[in-house]
Amino acid sequence: MDFAPELITIGQKAKDAARKLAYAGTAAKNKALLAMAEALLNHEQKILEANRKDVEAAIQKGTKKSLVNRLALTSEGIRQMSDALKEVVNLGDPVGEGEFWTRPNGLRIQRTRVPLGVVAMIYEARPNVTVDAAALCLKSGNAVILRGGSEAIESNKILSKVIAGAAESQGMPTACIQLLENTNRQWVQQLMKMNGYVDVIIPRGGAGLIETVVKEATVPVIETGTGVCHAYVDGEADLAKGVSIVFNAKTQKPGVCNALEAVLVNEAVAQEFLPLLGEKFRDYGVEIRGCEKTCAILPYAAKATEEDWGTEYLDLIISAKVVQGVDEAMDHIYQYGTKHSETIITENYTTAQRFLNEVDAAAVYVNASTRFTDGGRFGFGAEIGISTQKLHARGPMGLQALTTMKYMVYGEDHIVT
């Protein structure tokens, strides 16, 4: 494939920056991160002004309200981004971690963590991802090429300019943080095939974006999957817990990948549980799309279509199905789930253990909200995404997931015979 000359320049600059950043010390990287945090606050008005342009353009295009909400920044949001950078400073640096052993022949082997190299982030209308990705890549010694959604281009331009300038002012390599300002989709298609320049691509966004990257990229991809997350309310569930957990998982922040999209209810408790949950959802403005049995119990529920069962709504909508038991619930999750986060509400230990062991997902819960699938809530610190694949990384991906292993071998005239 012929690459745009400008894209080759960006790729080469990233490679050069990654080479230098790989051996940058922890103190130097932390100093740069603190400067980035301060710079965001110092440029708050410019950032808000640029973001306002993006939001106004999105509204004029008739963009969904939920997407506009994800796009919009506030003064508080900028302070939160600044605080997030400071939190990354407090995280341990994975680069250089490892172990050392000596073989019987005296050969000494050291396995140590090293950066991946050049990370390309392809994401949608969340300006905060620009800052989060840049911070995590810098702390883990990686150069990053950022390609955000066209809806957030003005926000991403100013954010990347501010943080990249701050990092470089503290001695970080020039071009360690770069943004693809050209919103032409051909550039994205080329970026996905830049083997030799880019070491890994991490897509972060909706199903369409992720599927496109996985399908078209020749560069290795870490798939941060969509979240069609389920809650199964068992026949031996504490129904008050069930209402609390399901309501939280759906409404606390509906536009994120670990939000609940479907609730499966054991037929033994459906007549009692669904009205309790349904009234609370209706008061909050959550639309319920249910199976025939659900609609018979909740007359205000809309009838679910086949498409609904596999849809990541990212909105105040939830699908609901009455099932015979845990086996049918797990079969449904197997068919429609995306291997992200699944939860069971039950007081039966044996049923809970079956669900934990038999459901294939990055995170499986008992009596807890799926909203806990998060690097910070798991104690990993900030995350670059939540991986639903099994190779290299799975679940919330923190700093360690942005490194790989290198073997350093020490000998004294050791030769193979």
Swiss-Prot record:
- Keywords assigned by UniProt, alphabetized: Amino-acid biosynthesis, Cytoplasm, NADP, Oxidoreductase, Proline biosynthesis
Gene Ontology biological-process annotations: L-proline biosynthetic process
This molecule's function is given as:
Catalyzes the NADPH-dependent reduction of L-glutamate 5-phosphate into L-glutamate 5-semialdehyde and phosphate. The product spontaneously undergoes cyclization to form 1-pyrroline-5-carboxylate.
Query: What Gene Ontology cellular-component terms does the record carry?
Result: cytoplasm
Under Gene Ontology molecular function, one entry of this record is: NADP binding
Concerning CDD domains, the annotation shows: ALDH_F18-19_ProA-GPR
Pathway(s) it belongs to: Amino-acid biosynthesis; L-proline biosynthesis; L-glutamate 5-semialdehyde from L-glutamate: step 2/2
Q: What's the encoding gene here?
A: proA
What superkingdom does the record give?
Bacteria
Q: Which protein, by its recorded name, is this?
A: Gamma-glutamyl phosphate reductase
Subcellular localization(s) per the UniProt record: Cytoplasm
List the source organism.
Desulfitobacterium hafniense (strain Y51)
Enzyme Commission identifier(s): 1.2.1.41
Q: What is the lineage of its organism?
A: Bacteria, Bacillati, Bacillota, Clostridia, Eubacteriales
